[in-house]
Design a protein with these regions (language model features):
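Walker A/P-loop NTP-binding motif
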Residues: 33-49
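Conserved pre-motif I regulatory segment
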Residues: 1-21
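Mg2+-dependent endonuclease catalytic cores in nucleic-acid-processing enzymes, primarily RNase H-like
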Residues: 264-371, 390-391, 400
Length: 402
């Protein structure tokens, strides 16, 4: 097995300083999860044939399998199969796998003493689960390992653990040690891959967190890579393999339907914007029918805050589907398309978009935008992000003189 220099420092820390809590945070693809998987394996091996219990915590059972168990299998050279209560045996001990994203997940960790835990993607776990798992690790010699990507610097994982790096117990034992990883620490990544990731990661918060591993608060304009000289076009004489729509219902603020096309080279086009105030659902049904008449029976990905409106669209023969509204992931998706010039806007067919793109800003101290100047941009996000996540309507390839 090979480790880069920072991974070696983590292993050395585990061997010689042996902190009660060891945290690796930082950039994606930097090697922090892999080294902690190895370290956790070393820790369990110290208790061979003791019949003790250990914990692996992750967002879901699927993420635990993907992020940890697959690597464990590769290291051990054997398959890991979970029992009905989601444990497997290792070195004569039991390792329990708990998903910990929900408020009541802490209940899964109750009822036994653990001799160690590995919390994967710790910022995605509920704080009560993290604290319950740590409290369970009361066996003599128990150790806790966490890995995570950076989020807002006020997150409990940073405040309660990372910011206490170097904390000592009264007996001289190191309690908490934290390591920070950047993408550049992983020297096993080839130069071409690193350059590609740099080029495709949106500027600002996303670059600081995903590449530099910095716990930074969001601030300023959300879509920093939008460039009117690049992203506005007059026409898109291209073949489109798919067309779909995003819908954000409104009244005092703008209601919006956007028409989005996906080209043959996987470039998205904002073809047209419909944005109006004080329009009832009957008006939007009419707009949707106009769109269907022009482009075919396309999908409409809708804000599900108004299920009654979605129902009315559906009974009028419109393929209205609940949008996926994950704010940060959706924004990251659209921001990446702007960064890579994979999202272009037909300038003459939009109006409200032109002001929103410059006034859509992050809420101070929060990983979410201010709820203002977001109507067309929300519908655009719903359209693109949902279509990427779902299997959208198939659209016969044809040439549009757009």
């Amino acid at each position: 097995m090979q480790f880069h220099e920072l991974q070696k420092k983590v292993i050395s820390c585990m061997k010689y300083e042996n902190p009660k809590i060891l945290v690796c945070s930082g950039a994606k693809r930097s090697g922090k999860t892999y080294v902690l998987t190895f370290v956790f394996l070393m820790h369990i091996s110290k208790f061979k044939n003791k019949g003790y219990s250990f914990i692996i915590g992750g967002t879901t059972q699927a993420s635990i399998r993907r992020n940890i168990l697959n690597d464990l299998e590769a290291i051990l050279g054997k398959s890991i199969n979970l029992s009905k209560d989601n444990h497997f045996r290792l070195f004569g001990n039991k390792v329990y796998c708990f998903d910990g994203a929900n408020a009541d997940s802490y209940k899964k960790a109750r009822g036994f003493t653990a001799y160690g835990a590995f919390l994967n993607e710790a910022t995605t776990l509920h704080d009560s689960f993290v604290k319950e798992v740590i409290s369970r690790c009361s066996g003599e010699g128990a150790r806790i390992y966490m890995d995570t990507n950076p989020e807002n610097p006020t997150h409990s994982v940073k405040v309660d653990y990372i910011d206490k790096d170097g904390q000592m117990l009264s007996n001289g034992q190191l309690n908490i040690k934290a390591f920070n990883f950047t993408l550049y620490d992983n020297t096993f990544l080839n130069k071409e891959y690193v350059e590609s990731i740099e080029a495709s990661t949106p500027s600002g918060m996303f670059f600081d967190r995903d590449i530099l591993g910095i716990w930074v608060a969001s601030e300023g304009v959300v879509y920093q890579d939008f460039n009117k000289d690049i992203h506005y076009i007059k026409e898109a004489n291209t073949e489109l393999k798919k067309i779909f729509c995003g819908v954000d219902f409104g009244w005092e603020h703008y209601g919006s339907i956007v028409v989005v096309g996906l080209g043959l080279v996987d470039r998205y086009y904002l073809i047209k914007e419909y944005a109006y105030k004080h329009k009832d659902i009957e008006y939007w049904i009419g707009i949707a029918k106009e769109i269907i008449k022009e482009y075919g029976n396309v999908n409409f990905y809708c804000d599900y805050a108004r299920p009654d409106y979605i129902y009315k669209l559906q009974i009028n023969g419109i393929r209205a589907i609940n949008a996926k509204k994950d704010v940060l992931e959706g924004i990251s998706t659209v921001a990446t398309l702007f960064k890579t010039n994979k999202l272009l806007i037909l300038e003459d067919n939009v109006n409200i978009f032109k002001s929103e793109i410059y006034n859509y800003v992050w809420a101070k101290g929060k990983d979410e935008p201010i709820k203002s100047s977001d109507d067309v941009l929300d519908s655009l996000r719903y359209a693109i992000y949902t279509d990427m996540k779902l299997t959208g309507s198939k659209f016969n390839r044809s040439k549009f003189g757009i």
